[in-house]
């Protein structure tokens, strides 16, 4: 059995409120969760954790009662009109919950401006003990591992990291040999799932799969063993595996979370 941190990502059980998510994570056998303080899209179902003080208290109580820890918070986007100072409330709340990692997306075509904002965010996050992780995604302005590395180099901050998500790594055609060259301190956690079938030509279909139709580890076609061997040993894993089909079939959040964990543990036994 691995002693690696395994965290339940919000997207896996997005229908749950943060306190419910903590409870499901504890029942399913996780050690950590990830919390969304900002929705990924305007359409998604979202609980206003950042503004709802009662919800914050309920979440803190569940964390205390279950012993579950918070690994990361998400998702902040670097856009052309971003004011980095506006992100401080997210950092303060994340630190209050004990999070050490922050998920950041690059949604600005001006690489220098985006890198400057990433540098400012790293400076803002440092007193909170939080490490911003730039997550590359094929449909964003930071579409692959190489692009993320360019932004980190331009930002020039030692607490700036890259978040490798198995789905995006596969669909962006990023390369394991490039991952091997990254300093391990730039890879403080990763997101795990599996992916079925070849890369679609349609970016809208890639986006749909990313948000609705991932696979549990071992149920798809990714070289997850190779990916995990390229990452730092025992790097914490956030299990981000949305499965809309199972949700529509009535499979509970607990059952989906448990399946994700069991499949991941089976995969890790192969490493």
Report residues per predicted region:
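Active-site acidic/histidine proton-transfer and metal-coordination neighborhood
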Residues: 20, 62-69, 77-162, 171, ...
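Histidine-acidic metal/acid-base catalytic patches
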Residues: 1-10, 15-32, 64, 93-98, ...
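Active-site-proximal loop/turn and secondary-structure-junction residues that shape catalytic pockets
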Residues: 12-14, 37-39, 77-79, 107-110, ...
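Surface-exposed, active-site-proximal loop segments in enzymatic domains
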Residues: 41-50, 76-91, 204-211, 215, ...
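Glycine-rich, proline-tolerant flexible connector loops at the mouths of alpha/beta enzymes
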Residues: 34-58
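Conserved beta-strand positions in the central sheet of alpha/beta enzyme cores
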Residues: 34, 72, 103, 133, ...
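Residue-level preference for long, well-ordered alpha-helices that form the structural scaffold
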Residues: 48, 52-55, 83, 110, ...
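Alpha-helix-loop-beta-strand connector modules within alpha/beta enzyme cores
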Residues: 50-71, 123-127, 222-229
